């Protein structure tokens, strides 16, 4: 997904993800509206979920509760 403004969201499944710990990503495109990326560790355990195009894929109430970073 490309564009000047990409709205992203990240949901941690694991309480703390160390740099380099996510070694496998499974990317799912969603009808040209965005992507959902699952991050896994070396043992295949799910660490977190990244959503690109979050404004298109998440409910406004979910975005409103999100912690803003960056």
Residue ranges and their predicted role:
Residues 56-68:
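A short, polar/charged loop-to-alpha-helix boundary motif
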Residues 7-52:
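A short, structured beta-strand/loop element
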Residues 1-2:
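Short amphipathic beta-strand and strand-loop transition segments with alternating hydrophobic
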């Amino acid at each position: 997904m490309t564009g000047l403004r990409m709205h992203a969201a990240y949901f941690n499944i694991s309480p703390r993800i160390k740099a380099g710990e996510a070694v496998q990503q499974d990317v799912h495109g969603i009808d040209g509206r965005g992507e959902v990326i699952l991050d896994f560790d070396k043992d295949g355990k799910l660490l977190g979920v990244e959503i690109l195009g979050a404004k298109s894929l998440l409910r406004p109430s979910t975005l409103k509760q999100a912690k803003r970073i960056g």
